[in-house]
């Protein structure tokens, strides 16, 4: 079985993988994943925000893990974390995806302006629009991103186009709420 193998890396959705790891700990009677896999050093994750899960992973991995994020969806594979010390995800500009970015402030207007990768700035939350070689044409995937670097182009995922509170103009983004809950 896998518990007897030399596992050095894991990849998956954080919420589901945490359930699996806790089950493995329960079945083996261990308290720490490194008691089972002493050479485990990397967890590649994506699909959901990792912030609410980080401390839970640290609590069951005594030697620590390197966490690296990917940004993928059913519509394509968009970005990867290239440095464990930098949360920015580098956009993959050569994966058959053409990107456009619509400022969140333009959402809901009759003719929202979109910006190319060359026109973005680092202080704006954007809805991401993609055109792919698989046939999607100006498809809004529903995610919002903010650029953390323009050379190379790196983003953080700030939420969903429909997941923010704006009762009084505060535009509370999902990532801010997640960070507050995690602290």
Indicate where each model-derived feature is located:
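Active-site glycine/GP-rich loop and adjacent strand/helix microenvironment
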Residues: 1-183
């Amino acid at each position: 079985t896998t518990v007897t193998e030399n596992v050095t890396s894991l990849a998956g959705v954080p919420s589901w993988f945490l359930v699996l790891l806790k089950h493995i700990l329960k079945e083996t009677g261990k308290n720490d994943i490194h008691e089972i896999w002493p050479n485990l050093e990397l967890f590649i994750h994506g699909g959901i925000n990792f912030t609410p899960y980080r401390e839970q992973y640290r609590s069951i991995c005594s030697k620590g893990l390197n966490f690296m994020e990917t940004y993928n969806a059913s519509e394509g594979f968009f970005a990867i974390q290239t440095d464990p010390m930098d949360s920015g995800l580098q956009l993959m500009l050569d994966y058959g995806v053409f990107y456009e970015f619509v400022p969140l402030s333009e959402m809901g207007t009759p003719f929202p302006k979109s910006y190319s990768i060359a026109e973005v700035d680092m202080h704006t939350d954007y809805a991401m629009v993609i055109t792919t070689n698989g046939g999607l044409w100006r498809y809004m995937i529903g995610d919002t991103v903010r650029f953390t670097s323009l050379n190379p182009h790196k983003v953080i995922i700030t939420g969903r186009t429909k997941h923010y509170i704006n009762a009084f103009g505060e535009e509370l983004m999902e990532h801010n709420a997640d960070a507050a809950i995690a602290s």
